Curated annotation (Swiss-Prot):
<comment type="function">
    <text>Catalyzes the GTP-dependent ribosomal translocation step during translation elongation. During this step, the ribosome changes from the pre-translocational (PRE) to the post-translocational (POST) state as the newly formed A-site-bound peptidyl-tRNA and P-site-bound deacylated tRNA move to the P and E sites, respectively. Catalyzes the coordinated movement of the two tRNA molecules, the mRNA and conformational changes in the ribosome.</text>
</comment>
<dbReference type="GO" id="GO:0032790">
    <property type="term" value="P:ribosome disassembly"/>
</dbReference>
<protein>
    <recommendedName>
        <fullName>Elongation factor G</fullName>
    </recommendedName>
</protein>
<dbReference type="InterPro" id="IPR047872">
    <property type="entry name" value="EFG_IV"/>
</dbReference>
<keyword id="KW-0648">Protein biosynthesis</keyword>
<dbReference type="InterPro" id="IPR005225">
    <property type="entry name" value="Small_GTP-bd"/>
</dbReference>
<dbReference type="Pfam" id="PF00009">
    <property type="entry name" value="GTP_EFTU"/>
</dbReference>
<keyword id="KW-0251">Elongation factor</keyword>
<dbReference type="Pfam" id="PF14492">
    <property type="entry name" value="EFG_III"/>
</dbReference>
<dbReference type="InterPro" id="IPR027417">
    <property type="entry name" value="P-loop_NTPase"/>
</dbReference>
<dbReference type="GO" id="GO:0003746">
    <property type="term" value="F:translation elongation factor activity"/>
</dbReference>
<comment type="similarity">
    <text>Belongs to the TRAFAC class translation factor GTPase superfamily. Classic translation factor GTPase family. EF-G/EF-2 subfamily.</text>
</comment>
<dbReference type="InterPro" id="IPR009022">
    <property type="entry name" value="EFG_III"/>
</dbReference>
<dbReference type="GO" id="GO:0005737">
    <property type="term" value="C:cytoplasm"/>
</dbReference>
<dbReference type="InterPro" id="IPR041095">
    <property type="entry name" value="EFG_II"/>
</dbReference>
<feature type="binding site">
    <location>
        <begin position="84"/>
        <end position="88"/>
    </location>
    <ligand>
        <name>GTP</name>
    </ligand>
</feature>
<dbReference type="Pfam" id="PF00679">
    <property type="entry name" value="EFG_C"/>
</dbReference>
């Protein structure tokens, strides 16, 4: 590996992710890429639990990918850094954080199913970060696989402008290869070829000639429209060269105006090499994407950019933290500008703390290749960073920048966890600290009432796996409670001039603070859920005490007034107050801020909010009525019904609290023929009768 350490020519580097629905064959596709690029010598099969990218025990047992390992490989003198992303909905944060540091992606679809709910969600996340993509229709060897149907679902469900640049030769068991519409040749894999390493380039089979011409014409029309010179040439009846066609497809892909579609079967080792060629031909290099944007630490309005060049000051974004069995904490970073040697000192400009880079590696799944220098445009794993967590920026101490970070959703589901012995208590706190570093959507708090540790996550599977890792990696023996919903509280009306005076006179210096506030419902533009405005004039409260009132109010928001759930969506306006020369203190004003917020919230029509999930059930028509009836009985609201490849799809919004154990109920109602997916949608007010139950349960009545 050493001779190919880090390519300095960034035009030959691709940072890509492979994104897909849970079973579209993403890990198998990644495995094949690593095999053909010469890194894995034995192909790992997910079915045997041997895949090299899936490196946690739970992943191999469950056959799904949870942590996005970053892997480097080489293809025809180009370097590809791949970030494997999970397709299961509970791990959307892993997908989001990988998309943030990618330049391009390969979207893998199941040739039989086309676009599935999860692929739709991941596609939308990629839109959010504006990631150029190529599409790979996988599993073309499966019974029922249909390339043209899959392409149609991309147009209809994703609204994407897709351009097939290949069509399949044969299908299902007779799938042999692909017709390359750019070169107008067929590439077929014979049964003898060892693991599909060699393929033959042959003339297009006669029965496909017409179809190939039809799709080639569509491709050329799309290509010709990118450039006037090409359009003139095309309309004038001249042949476009292969270079011209590829250049135009590249332009369309990088600007996200179109998405090239390829096909194959990773499992049967067909079509993977042409897909690798397409990654190099059409996806952007670090030089093709806009420079990284950020701001001066502490001054969000002062924007700065960093170009992907080693001459610029060093900047990098930490996008993942993992625990390694020997090295302890590994931090994955994407370097956006400059270069830095291992052992150097940098600054975590998000937190303002100095960090020393220990060893630097480029990773292959979980084998490490040490490197001396980290340079712009590449992805590395670093040892030795103490305070850096996901989303933090590292930069040159003399030229600091805070790069745009990622937003992580709040958990929607919680379980209480109780260690069995005193030594388990210590292991538990260590495991929680380690897991929280790795996964920003994993939240922990101590329940004041019960003294239990409560952990929160993005879904039942997410929490199952976290608890499983505590038991396995950290040997924690603990009792785990039933999953609970993460409710919130808010207010419905504005209350004005609510006052509170905190005073305590006991010989010596007492405590005194008086505050008057308005409290009103509030939702910020960027999803902010709290705002504090100071309107005190004439020094009625000294300036140094104002932040204490704000801090007190925020403390009080952690436990709401109805059932002790966190308060959200409030704006506090501090109007007036009074202080005492001797008895006032920051503490006194903090207590006053806290108490006045509780008093005001109680008068402002407080309500409980619950997480609502967008649920999509795919069912045979015979069970449609039962499925809808069942969703209605769970307080669900049916949003839409449609037909999809012979089955019915019901889309509904259902409260999370009603969805526990749904998977078993759905199976028994439909004899196991229906399946569902659910993603968090929004928080909504709880109906009065349910609210009463929640309050009674919380207050123990």
């Amino acid at each position: 590996m050493a001779q190919k350490d880090v390519l300095t020519d960034l035009t030959k580097v691709r940072n890509i992710g492979i994104m897909a629905h849970i079973d579209a064959g993403k890990t198998t596709t990644t495995e094949r890429i690593l095999y053909y690029t010469g890194i894995s010598y034995k192909i790992g099969e997910v079915h045997d639990g041997a895949a090299t990218m899936d490196w946690m025990e739970q992943e191999q047992e469950r056959g799904i990918t949870i942590t996005s390992a970053a892997t480097t490989c080489f293809w025809n003198d180009n370097q590809i850094n791949i970030i494997d992303t999970p397709g299961h909905v509970d791990f959307t944060v892993e997908v989001e954080r990988s998309l943030r540091v990618l330049d391009g992606a390969v979207a893998v679809f199941d040739g039989k199913e086309g676009v599935e709910p999860q692929s739709e969600q991941v596609w939308r996340q990629a839109d959010k970060y504006d990631v150029p993509r190529i599409c790979f229709v996988n599993k073309m060897d499966k019974i029922g696989a249909d390339f043209y149907f899959s392409v149609r679902t991309m147009e209809e469900r994703l609204g994407a402008n897709v351009i097939p640049i290949q069509i399949p030769v044969g299908s299902e068991g007779d799938f042999e290869g692909v017709v390359d519409l750019v070169e107008m040749k067929a590439k077929v894999w014979s049964a003898e070829a060892k693991l599909g390493e060699k393929y033959d380039v042959v003339d297009i089979p006669a029965d496909l000639q017409e179809k190939a011409e039809e799709y080639r014409t569509k491709l050329l029309e799309a290509v010709a429209e990118t450039d006037e010179a090409l359009l003139d040439k095309y309309l004038g009846g001249e042949e476009l060269t292969i270079e011209e066609i590829k250049g135009a497809i590249r332009k369309l892909t990088i600007s996200s105006e179109a998405y090239p579609v390829l096909c194959g079967s990773a499992f049967k080792n067909k079509g993977v090499q042409p897909m690798l060629d397409a990654v190099i031909d059409y996806l952007p290099s670090p030089l093709d994407v806009p420079p990284a944007e950020g701001h001066v630490p502490g001054k969000e309005e002062e924007l700065i950019t960093r170009k992907p060049s080693t001459d610029e000051p060093f900047s990098a974004l930490a996008f993942k933290v993992a625990t390694h069995p020997f090295f302890g904490k590994l931090t994955y970073v994407r370097v956006y500008s400059g270069k830095v040697d291992s052992g150097s000192q940098v600054i975590n400009s998000t937190k303002g703390k100095k960090e020393r880079l220990g060893k630097l590696f480029q990773m292959h799944s979980n084998k490490e290749n040490p490197v001396e220098t980290a340079s712009a445009g590449h992805i590395y794993a670093v040892i030795g960073l103490k305070d850096t967590t996901t989303g933090d920026t590292l930069s040159d101490p003399n030229h600091q920048i805070v790069l745009e970070s990622m937003t992580f959703p709040d958990p929607v589901i919680e379980v209480a966890i109780e260690p069995k012995t005193k030594s388990d208590q210590e292991k538990l706190s260590l495991s929680i600290q380690k897991l929280a570093e790795e996964d920003p959507t994993f939240k922990v708090h101590l329940d004041q009432e019960t003294g239990q540790t409560v952990i929160g996550g993005m879904g039942e599977l997410h929490l199952d796996i976290l608890v499983d890792r505590m038991r396995r990696e950290f040997k924690v023996e603990a009792n785990v409670g039933k999953p609970q919903v993460a409710y919130k509280e808010t207010i419905r009306r504005k209350v004005e001039n609510v006052e509170y005076t905190h005073k305590k006179q006991t010989g010596g210096s007492g405590q005194f603070a008086k505050v008057i506030i308005n409290l009103e419902p509030f939702t910020g533009e960027d999803g902010a859920t709290y705002e504090f405005e100071n309107k005190v004039t004439g020094g009625r409260i000294p300036r140094e005490y104002i932040p204490s009132v704000d801090a007190g109010a925020q403390d009080a928001m952690q436990y709401g007034v109805l059932a002790g759930y966190p308060l959200v969506n409030l704006k506090v306006t501090l109007l007036d107050g009074a202080f005492h020369e001797v008895d006032s203190s920051e503490m006194a004003f903090k207590i006053a801020g806290s108490q006045v917020l509780k008093k005001a919230a109680a008068q402002a029509q407080p309500v409980i909010l619950e997480p609502i999930m967008a649920v999509e059930v795919t069912t045979p028509e015979d069970y449609m009525g039962d499925v809808i009836g069942d969703l209605n009985s769970r307080r669900g609201q049916i949003q839409a019904m449609e037909e999809r490849s012979g089955a019915r799809v019901v889309k509904a919004h259902v409260p999370l609290s009603e969805m526990f154990g749904y998977v078993g109920d759905l199976r028994s109602k439909t004899q196991g023929r229906a399946n569902y997916s659910m993603v968090f949608d929004s928080y909504a007010e709880v109906p009065a009768n349910v609210s009463k139950e929640i309050i009674a349960k919380a207050t123990g009545q």
